[in-house]
Amino acid sequence: VYSELVKTYVGSKNELSDIGNQLIYEIERRLEKGISSEWIIFIPNMRALVSESNLSEQQLQFMFENGYRVGMRFIIGTDYTYIGTGIDPIPRYLKTNVQWVIFGMRLMDQTFLDKGMYSRDGVPNSDLVYLHSRKEVIKLKISKNK
């Protein structure tokens, strides 16, 4: 479905295994040539990308610390157990360095952002999520699938 709407779509394990190296190459190329055109990279399953591409923690840091300088914006999806409770270096890096997080759960139930004054929040409806920037929380209403 999405393959017709995006410029590059990686949908198989074979393609996934090389995409990390391709992204690093693109960042290096852009840094060298001074290219900074906007490019949104959506990674719906970070756990799969890490396991299939064998990205190291250093490579991941390079991607996130240099990608924004050349116009590359990463939107990462993953299950909560990977980033919220994972003890491996890559989920820990993500946990401490992501700028924005979207939760479809009570803020009190998550373990990696400050819970602040949200200790009494209820379970959000299925069409509500929290957008958290580490400084503020915004409640967003999203559309429901029918």
What do the predicted segments below correspond to?
Residues 126-132:
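Short polybasic amphipathic segments
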